[in-house]
């Protein structure tokens, strides 16, 4: 199924191994793809190193749940703690495009409150940036992907979307009916980064249901189709099937490049004036810990002891309801209706922060697994449930689990195929988390019943790993500053979901890409100072650049006035 870049006819610049590039980006996913494009368009020499393959969307992506297994990071990891996370297909992507290849493409923004959780609610942490700092990049990325959604989105910072919403499927109808019966506001038709009209050479969504299998038709946005092609056109290089093993620190206290293994297990060293880590919430801290060296014996850029700590996952329970009439939840994008009415802290609750309720659309194999988990169905019992698939609807709750110091990534004694220590992930729910999840499950089940379900069951699960290299103003309690530069090393940056201090109850994909665009603007604004100076310009705002080529987003079908 998988083919390396060498078998894909994609012209690109090739840097010689001895050449020193301006930026080496580790991981070409949601953040890495945006960074690669921005920096290449600004004229920098940039190489992206990706552990997975460079996907050929026609050859490698299939309308089949089992056949999409290799889209995910399924290499060994160790999981533990009192509430261990299931690591693998639900959390991490592998290959160019990263998690944006298999995301469902829900793209809500974080709320203004998410950036000052500690100040407002006395829990979690504040971000070193505000909603206003990232708002222009939300708007920019919503056009670039583009995002389809309602004309008015009422929660957080109210706003609308330039591209009209998708039609409702059966699951959306059930959510609307349930919310309406309980007087709960609901958003219809998005926001979702799936085309509701033709867009350049990308077609309208055909509502086939295989969104998290890569989207063979190209209607769903991923950086593989939205940003990487332009990056290559502007001189970037991507080396796929290259596993970065260590970031090298020079005697002058600055990084000099990265060591990596190719597909044959041969070792290489890519020299770089600056390095950006975009490997996400497990692989980025794992790489920093594996890069321990004299002066940083407990992990590179880890003078605070914070690398790997404050890992977060959202509560992602799936509530399923059976309806007398067919629902056919595979029709329409899985992500097409939601409510964030319970997102913010309510003083009447016995917990801080909140949750969202969204439509989801598990395909038959995933549905079967959920029936096993929720109803202990097996054998003929499972067969009966599977035969009833068209009558079931599924809602997913997204609950904000707070950042806790003991939820962390460390190194295991186990080794991967390259001999590198694999990640050990320890996760624990605290009392606030448990109370929030209990309330969220009860509310989601109530909405399902109000929507007309005659039977309701639920599966406990988690979604969306973030944190473990948090950003902050204090070098004693965080890993990077507000622009993603590590506090300890002036030419080493982290830009991915691992920098989140808190996570809200919104899917993180849009925020990850918006942060990448903001970091890129900062790097471009600073220019060669990034490569030569240890001084940090924290006062100058990044100059916002409309670097996305108009031809990539200007030909869509805008909302009718």
Describe the role of every protein-language-model region:
Residues 1-23, 41-42, 525-561:
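Extreme N-terminal leader/targeting segments of oxidoreductases
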Residues 20, 188-195, 203-211, 218, ...:
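A glycine-rich dinucleotide-binding beta-alpha-beta segment and adjacent secondary-structure elements
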Residues 23-48:
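N-terminal Rossmann-like FAD-binding beta1-loop-alpha1 element of flavoenzymes
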Residues 38-41, 45, 52-62, 217, ...:
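Glycine-rich loop(s) and the adjacent beta-strand/alpha-helix scaffold that form part
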Residues 67-155, 345, 405:
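Redox-cofactor-proximal catalytic regions of oxidoreductases
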Residues 83, 118-244, 465, 470:
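Conserved redox-cofactor binding core of oxidoreductases
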Residues 84-90, 127-131, 304-423, 477, ...:
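FAD cofactor-binding and catalytic pocket of flavoenzymes
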Residues 502-521:
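A conserved FAD-binding loop/helix module that cradles the flavin
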């Amino acid at each position: 199924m998988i083919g390396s870049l060498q078998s894909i006819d994609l012209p690109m610049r090739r840097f010689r191994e001895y050449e020193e590039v301006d930026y080496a980006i580790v991981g070409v996913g949601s953040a890495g793809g945006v960074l690669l494009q921005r920096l290449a368009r600004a004229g920098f020499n940039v190489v992206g190193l990706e552990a997975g393959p460079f996907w050929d969307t026609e050859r490698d992506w299939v309308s089949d749940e089992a056949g999409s297994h290799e889209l995910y990071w399924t290499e060994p990891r160790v999981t533990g703690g009192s509430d261990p996370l299931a690591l693998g297909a639900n959390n991490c992507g592998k290959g160019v495009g990263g998690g944006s290849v298999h995301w469902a493409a829900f793209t809500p923004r974080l709320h203004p409150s998410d950036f000052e959780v500690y100040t407002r609610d006395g829990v979690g942490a504040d971000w070193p940036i505000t909603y206003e700092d990232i708002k222009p990049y939300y708007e920019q990325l919503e056009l670039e992907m583009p995002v389809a959604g309602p004309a008015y989105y009422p929660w957080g910072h109210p706003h609308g979307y330039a591209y009209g919403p998708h039609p409702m499927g059966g699951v959306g109808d059930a959510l609307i009916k349930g919310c309406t019966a309980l007087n709960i506001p609901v958003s219809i038709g998005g926001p979702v980064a799936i085309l509701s009209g033709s867009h350049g050479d990308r077609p309208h969504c055909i509502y086939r249901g295989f969104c998290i299998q890569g989207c063979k038709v190209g209607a769903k946005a991923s950086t593989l189709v939205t940003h990487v092609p332009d990056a290559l056109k502007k001189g970037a290089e991507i080396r796929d099937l290259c596993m970065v093993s260590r970031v090298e620190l020079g005697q002058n206290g600055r990084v000099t490049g990265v060591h990596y293994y190719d597909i044959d297990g041969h070792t290489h060293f890519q020299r770089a004036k600056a390095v950006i880590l975009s490997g996400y919430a497990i692989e980025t801290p794992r790489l920093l810990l594996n890069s321990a060296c004299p002066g940083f014996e407990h992990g590179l850029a880890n003078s605070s002891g914070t690398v790997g700590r404050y890992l977060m996952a959202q509560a992602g329970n799936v509530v399923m309801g059976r309806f007398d009439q067919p629902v056919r939840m595979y029709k329409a994008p899985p992500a097409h209706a939601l409510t964030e009415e319970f997102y913010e802290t309510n003083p009447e609750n016995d917990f801080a922060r909140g949750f969202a309720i969204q439509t989801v659309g598990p395909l038959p194999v995933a549905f079967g697994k959920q029936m096993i988990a929720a109803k202990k169905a097996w054998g003929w019992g499972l067969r009966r449930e599977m035969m009833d698939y068209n009558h079931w609807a599924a809602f997913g709750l997204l609950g904000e689990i707070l950042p806790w110091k003991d939820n962390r990534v460390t190194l295991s004694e186990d080794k991967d195929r390259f001999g590198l220590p694999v990640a050990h992930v320890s996760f624990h729910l605290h009392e606030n988390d448990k109370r929030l999840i209990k309330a969220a499950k009860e509310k989601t089940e109530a909405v399902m019943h109000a929507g007309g379900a005659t039977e309701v069951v639920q599966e406990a699960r988690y979604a969306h790993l973030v944190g473990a290299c948090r950003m902050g103003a204090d070098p004693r309690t965080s890993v990077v500053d507000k622009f993603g530069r590590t506090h300890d090393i002036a030419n080493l940056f982290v830009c991915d979901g691992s920098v989140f201090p808190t996570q809200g109850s919104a899917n993180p994909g849009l925020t990850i890409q918006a942060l990448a665009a903001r970091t890129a603007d900062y790097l471009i604004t600073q220019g060669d100072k990034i490569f030569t100076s240890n001084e940090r310009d924290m006062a100058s705002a990044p100059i916002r650049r409309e670097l996305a080529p108009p031809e990539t987003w200007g030909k869509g079908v805008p909302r009718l006035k």
